[in-house]
């Protein structure tokens, strides 16, 4: 977590406030007091506020700022957005501000989805919006582009795996390309694929209504009710879009099997 300070000492203090291990307890609660120890000589630790985290403060020469570097050992216990808010709180108590977040390595997609939904709920906004919009909220809320550009296609595990799959998909076509492909003299894509696509569009329209209702003046107290309907709508959209290609692929597999089992001409 990037800080608006160059003080490694301040960064360390914040890290010790939040990391699970915490800091050694000292006599009188003073920073310079003697470390309190158990009979076996090991220091008595005052636990930090975040479970399943390890953290330390350091100075980054490349950017000229101090940072709380955190290793999150179990995101089910302490998710990224919870750690971000807690570091912000601890920093503010010491007169420091968190300016952004740097993610080193790859992350599961759900980390950003959960973060985006968390910050949307804090704003009392509907979470039933497209996946890429939720991820944008997460990026902006936690300042993931504070020091350098953040490209989800390069940082999210699922997106990297998707990009490695070079199989052409119908859902990646434009509307006109999809219509043209359907009109060609080939049996697929056919009725099942078109029905799935129409179902996705119908669910998308219903989701639009739920999202508009969630933010309608006078219905502020009902935002969560409409958000739940929008979430259900987005789930239907995703499943229907999956079926767009699944129907065509299933038909093609059947045709391949029929071709394989057909008797060879004599």
What is the predicted function of each stretch?
Residues 260-265:
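Conserved small/polar residues in nucleotide/adenosyl-binding loops
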Residues 209-217:
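Transmembrane signal-anchor/signal-peptide helices with a preference for the extracytoplasmic
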Residues 217-256:
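A structural-propensity feature for long, helix-poor, extended segments
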Residues 1-172:
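Long, contiguous binding/interaction regions
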Residues 169-189:
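Short, hydrophobic/aliphatic alpha-helical segments
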Residues 184-207:
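Conserved phosphate/anionic-ligand binding catalytic regions in large, soluble enzymes, centered on
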Residues 178, 201-208, 243-246, 250:
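Amphipathic, well-ordered alpha-helical segments in soluble domains
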């Amino acid at each position: 977590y990037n800080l608006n300070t160059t003080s490694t000492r301040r960064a360390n203090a914040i890290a010790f406030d939040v990391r699970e291990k915490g800091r050694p307890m000292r006599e009188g609660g003073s920073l310079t007091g003697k470390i309190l120890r158990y009979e076996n000589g090991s220091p008595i630790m005052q636990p930090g506020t975040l479970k399943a985290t390890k953290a330390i403060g350091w100075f980054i020469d490349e950017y000229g700022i101090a940072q709380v570097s955190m290793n999150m050992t179990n995101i089910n216990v302490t998710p990224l957005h919870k750690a971000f808010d807690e570091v912000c709180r601890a920093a503010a108590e010491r007169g420091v501000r968190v300016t952004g977040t740097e993610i080193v390595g790859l992350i599961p997609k759900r980390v950003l989805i959960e973060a985006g939904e968390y910050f949307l709920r804090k704003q009392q906004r509907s979470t039933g919006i497209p996946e890429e919009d939720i991820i944008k909220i997460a990026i902006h809320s936690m300042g993931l582009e504070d020091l350098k550009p953040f490209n989800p296609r390069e940082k999210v595990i699922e997106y990297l795996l998707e990009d490695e799959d070079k199989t052409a998909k119908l859902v990646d076509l434009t509307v006109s390309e999809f219509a043209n492909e359907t009109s060609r003299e080939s049996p697929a894509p056919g009725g099942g694929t078109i029905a799935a696509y129409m179902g996705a569009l119908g669910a998308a329209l219903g989701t639009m209504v739920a999202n508009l209702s969630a933010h309608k003046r006078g219905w502020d107290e009902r935002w969560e009710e409409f958000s739940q309907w929008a979430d259900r709508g987005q789930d239907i959209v995703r499943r229907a879009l999956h079926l767009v290609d699944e129907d065509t692929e299933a038909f093609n597999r059947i045709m391949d099997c029929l071709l394989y089992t057909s008797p060879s001409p004599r």
